[in-house]
Amino acid sequence: MTPALSPSRASDFMQCPLLYRFRVIDRLPEPPSAAAARGTLVHAALERVFDLPAPERTPEATVALLPGEWARLVEEEPELASLLTGPVAGATSPGEAIVAETDADRERAWLEEAAGFVRTWFTLEDPRRLEPAERELYVEAEVDGLVLRGYVDRLDVAPDGRLRVVDYKTGRSPSEQWEGKALFQMKFYALVLWRTRGVVPTLLQLVYLRDGEV
């Protein structure tokens, strides 16, 4: 079997080879991450909104997609439901947690937090004026005996054939010290697209939804 590598796993290896071993070779189980789940939820809504006719791609319509997308994610990965259950921070007893906050309250707060990222996106881009060529595009290419693969959040193609690769980030925009990790991921995608399409992307665009920066 030809070895395969995604940008996130390549980043793991560069950051810490032992972390790479735990995740890829030993496959040690990891509990669900609230940050990762929130990112997946927001990404899903920003992907699905383009199924709507352009005039209907509003902030309200996109936020309305969140409950259904969250239900779908939980159905696919039931362990995600554990992120919205259990004692609240600061509660002195399980009973107090139940009084202080129910699971329904947690879900409403969770969805509202995700909605904040969606609303920020609309201050940066207008989906009514966009028609992506691809969304959540799986890309794969073999380079020097190694399969490089991953998912591109959005691929825009201009009438003259120029490519723009867009990646949504729900974390904070990194300092210069850590910016290289995000740029590495984009260069990874650019290499794979060049190998598969014969075109080097003209623009690699990171969209930071927490800070509202591009």
Enumerate the predicted regions with their spans:
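A non-catalytic, helix-rich entry segment at domain boundaries
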Residues: 45-135
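Mg2+/Mn2+-dependent nuclease catalytic core
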Residues: 137-214
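Short, hydrophobic/amphipathic alpha-helical patches that form generic packing surfaces
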Residues: 19-24, 43-51
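Short conserved micro-motifs on helix faces and helix-strand junctions that flank
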Residues: 13-14, 40, 150
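Short, polar/flexible loop-turn hinges at active-site or ligand-entry regions and domain interfaces
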Residues: 26-35, 51-57, 175-178
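Hydrophobic (often cysteine-bearing) scaffold residues that line and stabilize catalytic clefts
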Residues: 34, 38, 42, 110, ...
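C-terminal, charged and often intrinsically disordered regions of DNA end-processing helicases
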Residues: 1-36
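A residue-level signal for conserved active-site and pocket-lining positions in enzyme catalytic cores
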Residues: 16, 42-43, 114, 154, ...
